[in-house]
Amino acid sequence: MIELDRDAMTPMYVQLANVLRDRIRRGEIPVGRRLPSQSELEEETGGVVSRRTIKSALEVLADEGLVQGVQGKGVFVIALPAGGQS
């Protein structure tokens, strides 16, 4: 389950990107593995975020060079965050 704080000053998409980045950093989602789909992430958050919010979080990770979308396949981890696994 992904827990996000609706009342936090940090936008929901940033909170979600942070959670996913941490999972990548810890090796829970290793390089080469597909991230959960948007519908799976929506379910993991208990439906508190929209698909647009999820897409924005994935765009943040893509802009950081951590993930890449593959048409018809999903979004895959392509690199570790700075600092690697902890």
Predicted regions mapped to residue ranges:
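Extreme N-terminal segment that seeds HTH/winged-HTH DNA-binding domains in transcriptional regulators
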Residues: 1-52, 56-68, 73, 79-86
